[in-house]
């Protein structure tokens, strides 16, 4: 592999030919801010927050897409670069819904963090075109609010490149450009499989999970309700990271105690329903194997996978197990067997 030497802020670094300035900077331990960049997935230079100066060039270049050359000298933190990044951020914010207090991503928003880092207090210098976009709440699990979209196209890449679905894309041009499905269809009318990857990569609150916290509090406060909760096996080993604990810390005891203190009457582990799933799927497999049913038998543990199969590979539907997912099985058990055992009216 051919290697080239690049100097970034006076630090010499050797990287493979064809690397971008951003990749070279990371190797040199130099941070360059980005908003639209996702390595190998979304490298389009759309946000222009990663602009840098290159010695001998008149204008600035976007570090996420511009390739390095042997002997290149790059400057990432000059006054000119800082002013350009700040102006680009102000322009993005001038057309952005700045209702941060009511945004689900407040405090965990990449745009908000960069605005703070660059000392942006207002956008009075610019009069952006603030379009009125309807909020799409048609899907059961998520909503889309284009007034908070910065057109980074991360969600488009996650849907099309990572997942291979391609439900959403950039519609219209100019100030009317926005992310939407084909023919502006609501999300529940598309072939979206509810994978949630667009939510994961969105840097703002433009795409987010629906929040049922208020409904949970209402249920906990209702003296006529017996409220139970189930926790997935993975949560006990991942929840601790949200509280800066080492990766993999088992917080099951703390989690159960916290749920009980919140007011839940019972806390159950979905492990139990996973055992039921194993027994049900094994029984179904034996029945198909001995009675001549459709093989192979494919698990149906993930509703998202089932929807993906039904939408894109309907020819495999006969191979899907008829069993519910562990989460769904527990819901059924809680409202039947458990309710009867406890003398409750579900």
Q: Over which residues does each language-model region extend?
A:
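Short, contiguous acidic and Ser/Thr-rich linear segments
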Residues: 9-19
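Structural motif corresponding to the C-terminal cap of alpha-helices
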Residues: 163, 202, 338-342
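Eukaryote-biased recognition of intrinsically disordered, low-complexity regulatory segments
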Residues: 1-11
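Iron-sulfur-associated redox domains of electron-transfer enzymes in respiratory
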Residues: 4, 17-77, 81, 210-346
């Amino acid at each position: 592999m051919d290697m080239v030497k690049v100097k970034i802020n006076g630090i010499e670094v050797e990287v493979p030919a064809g690397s971008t300035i951003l990749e070279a900077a990371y190797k040199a331990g130099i941070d360059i801010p980005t908003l639209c960049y996702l390595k190998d997935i979304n490298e389009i230079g759309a946000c222009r927050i990663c602009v840098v100066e290159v010695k001998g060039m008149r204008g600035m270049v976007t570090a996420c897409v511009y390739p390095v050359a042997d002997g290149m000298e790059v400057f990432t933190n000059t006054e000119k670069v800082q002013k350009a990044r700040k102006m680009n951020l102000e322009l993005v914010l001038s057309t952005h819904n700045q209702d941060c207090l009511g945004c689900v991503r407040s405090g965990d928003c990449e745009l908000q963090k960069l605005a703070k880092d660059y000392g942006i207090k207002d956008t009075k210098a610019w009069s952006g075109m603030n379009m009125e976009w309807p909020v799409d709440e048609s899907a059961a699990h998520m909503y889309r609010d284009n007034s908070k979209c910065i057109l980074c196209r991360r969600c488009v890449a996650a849907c099309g490149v990572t997942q291979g679905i391609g439900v959403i894309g950039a519609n219209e041009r100019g100030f009317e450009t926005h992310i939407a499905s084909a023919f502006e269809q609501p999300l529940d009318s598309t072939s979206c499989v509810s994978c949630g990857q667009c939510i994961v990569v969105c840097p703002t609150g433009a795409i987010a999970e629906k929040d049922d916290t208020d409904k949970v509090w209402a249920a906990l406060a209702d003296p006529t309700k017996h409220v139970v909760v189930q926790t997935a096996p993975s949560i006990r080993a991942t929840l601790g990271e949200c509280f800066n604990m080492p990766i993999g810390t088992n917080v099951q005891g703390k989690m159960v105690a916290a749920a009980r203190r919140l007011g839940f009457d019972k806390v159950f582990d979905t492990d139990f329903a996973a055992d039921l799933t194993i027994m049900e799927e094994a029984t179904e497999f034996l029945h198909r194997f001995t009675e001549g049913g459709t093989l192979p038998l494919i698990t149906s543990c993930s509703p998202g996978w089932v929807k993906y199969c039904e939408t894109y590979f309907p020819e495999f539907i006969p191979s899907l197990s008829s069993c519910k997912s562990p989460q769904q099985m527990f819901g059924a058990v809680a409202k039947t067997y458990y309710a009867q055992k406890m003398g409750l009216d579900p």
